[in-house]
C-alpha cells in the first residue's frame, strides 16, 4: 500500500474515533443549524475578508472570521477574490454569495456538532482539489462558525481534544522582512522562542520584554523605522545575519539568556527570493546546497531552534539534503512546501524533506481537513506549529486549535496589535484552566 494511503487510513481511523469521543452530551447535541450568513469585514491590512455566522435552532450563534496570507504557496487552496477595480481587486462579494447561497443551502438542517458531516457537505459541493468553486475562504468561514456554534458557551480546545492538551510555546515575530515589510531584509520573520520557563504567562512576559528591548536596540543603532504586517520592527539592514545579531542583543538587553531561556526561529520564506537562476539573498545568487551551508553557518553561531521554508516549495532535493544533515539540531518546518495539504505532507514524509509542518487552516479550507493533517504529521513524528496569517483578524480560534490538538507550538506574530494579541490573550485565558505548558526546546 502506498505511504500516502496508509497514513491517511490511519489518520482517518483516529479522527473518526476522536469525533465519536467528542462531548456529544445534551450540551452539544441538538444544535441544528437554522441559518448560515456571511458578510464582508476588514482584516488587519485593511483588505476585505469574510465573516460567517452560524445560528442554531436553540439560539446559539457561532461567528468566525477568515485570515489571509501575503506570501502564499502556489499549492494552497484558492482564496476567492472578485478581481476588477473595487477594493483593488480584493473584494469577496462572490465568496460571500457562496456562503449565503450554496453553502447555506447545504448546511441548514445539519447538526453543527457533527463537524465531519458539516465539512463533508461543503466538500461534496466543491470537490475540486483547490476548492476553486466555492473558495477556501468561504468554506473555512462556515466550517469555523459551525464549530463555534457547536461549542456554544463551552471551550473549543476541550471540544476538539482527545484528552491530551498543553499551552503551546509561542514563536513571536519581532523583526519583519520579506513580503511582510517594506525593507531590504530577505528573511521574512525573525522570531523569539521563550521556551525556558515553567508557564505560559512567564514566557509571554519574556517575549514582550524582549520585543520592547529590540525597539530600544534598533533605536540606539539608528535603525528604528516602521513595522511590518505582523507587528514586528522592519529596519533596513546591511545583511540578513544582522537581524540575528540584533535579536540576540535584544534578548541579552532584556535580561534573558540566549539559548537557555530564549532561542530564535526563522521563517526564511525562500520562495519569495527564488528566481530561475537561483536564490537571491544578500546580493548573491545561490543554489540550494550553498544556501543550506549558509543556514548551517548561522546554526553554528546563533541559538536557532527552527527554520521555516528554507528552500522553495518544489525544491525537494535541497529540503532533503538539509534535513538529513541538520535535522538533528534544528526544526526544519514546511509551510509553502506542504500548504496544510495531506498529499503534499505524505510526499514530504516519504522524502524525509523536513521534520515539522506549519498548519494554516485557510490553506486547506475546513476544520476537519486541518485535524487530519495534524494527525498525519503527529503520526510521522513531525513537530506541529499552528499559525496565523499576515492578514489577520480578531478571531482567536487558532489558540484553541493549538491547545486542543496538543500542537506544542503557535506562531501568531509580534506581541502587539490586537489582531495578534487576541491569540496571546486567549492563551492566557485558557492557561487558567489548562496548566500544562509545552516542554519543547527545553532540552537546550
Model regions: which residues?
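Short, Gly/Pro- and small/polar-rich lid/capping loops
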Residues: 13-48
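Conserved phosphate/anionic-ligand binding catalytic regions in large, soluble enzymes, centered on
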Residues: 50, 130-150, 169-185, 229-232, ...
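Mobile "lid/hinge" segments at catalytic clefts and subdomain interfaces of large enzymes
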Residues: 165-228
Amino acid at each position: 500500500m502506498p505511504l500516502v494511503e496508509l497514513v491517511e487510513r490511519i489518520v482517518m481511523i483516529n479522527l473518526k474515533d476522536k469525533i465519536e469521543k467528542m462531548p456529544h452530551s445534551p450540551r452539544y447535541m441538538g444544535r441544528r443549524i437554522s441559518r448560515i450568513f456571511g458578510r464582508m469585514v476588514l482584516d488587519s491590512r485593511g483588505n476585505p475578508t469574510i465573516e460567517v455566522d452560524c445560528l442554531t435552532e436553540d439560539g446559539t450563534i457561532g461567528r468566525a472570521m477568515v485570515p489571509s496570507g501575503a506570501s502564499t504557496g502556489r499549492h494552497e487552496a484558492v482564496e476567492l477574490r472578485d478581481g476588477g477595480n473595487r477594493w483593488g481587486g480584493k473584494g469577496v462579494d462572490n465568496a460571500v454569495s457562496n456562503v449565503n447561497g450554496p453553502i447555506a443551502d447545504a448546511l441548514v438542517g445539519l447538526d453543527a456538532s457533527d463537524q465531519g458531516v458539516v465539512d463533508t457537505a461543503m466538500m461534496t459541493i466543491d470537490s475540486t482539489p483547490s476548492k476553486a468553486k466555492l473558495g477556501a475562504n468561504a468554506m473555512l468561514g462556515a466550517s469555523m462558525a459551525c464549530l463555534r456554534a457547536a461549542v456554544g458557551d463551552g471551550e473549543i480546545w476541550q471540544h476538539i481534544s482527545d484528552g491530551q492538551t498543553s499551552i503551546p510555546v509561542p514563536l513571536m515575530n519581532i523583526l519583519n522582512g520579506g513580503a511582510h515589510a517594506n525593507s531590504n531584509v530577505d528573511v521574512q520573520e525573525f522570531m523569539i522562542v521563550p521556551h525556558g520557563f515553567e508557564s505560559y504567562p512567564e514566557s509571554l512576559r519574556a517575549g514582550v520584554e524582549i520585543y520592547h528591548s529590540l525597539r530600544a536596540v534598533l533605536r540606539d543603532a539608528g535603525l528604528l523605522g516602521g513595522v511590518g504586517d505582523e507587528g514586528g520592527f522592519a529596519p533596513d539592514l546591511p545583511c540578513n545575519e544582522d537581524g540575528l545579531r540584533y535579536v540576540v542583543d535584544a534578548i541579552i538587553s532584556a535580561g534573558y539568556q540566549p539559548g537557555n531561556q530564549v532561542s530564535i526561529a526563522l521563517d526564511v520564506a525562500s520562495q519569495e527570493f527564488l528566481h530561475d537562476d537561483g536564490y537571491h539573498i544578500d546580493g548573491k545568487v545561490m543554489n540550494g546546497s550553498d544556501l543550506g551551508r549558509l543556514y548551517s553557518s548561522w546554526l553554528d553561531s546563533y541559538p536557532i531552534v527552527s527554520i521555516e521554508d528554507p528552500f522553495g516549495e518544489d525544491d525537494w532535493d535541497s529540503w532533503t539534503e538539509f534535513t538529513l544533515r541538520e535535522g538533528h539540531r534544528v526544526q526544519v518546518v514546511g509551510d509553502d512546501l506542504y500548504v496544510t495539504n495531506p498529499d503534499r505532507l505524505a510526499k514530504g514524509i516519504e522524502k524525509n524533506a523536513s521534520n515539522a509542518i506549519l498548519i494554516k487552516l485557510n490553506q486547506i479550507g475546513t476544520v476537519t481537513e486541518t485535524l487530519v493533517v495534524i494527525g498525519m504529521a503527529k503520526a510521522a513524528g513531525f513537530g506541529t506549529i499552528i499559525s496565523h496569517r499576515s492578514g489577520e483578524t480578531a478571531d482567536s480560534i487558532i489558540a484553541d486549535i493549538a491547545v486542543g490538538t496538543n500542537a506544542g507550538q503557535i506562531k501568531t506574530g509580534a506581541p502587539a496589535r490586537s489582531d495578534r494579541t487576541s491569540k496571546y490573550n486567549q492563551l492566557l485565558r485558557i492557561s487558567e484552566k489548562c496548566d500544562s505548558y509545552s516542554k519543547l526546546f527545553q532540552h537546550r
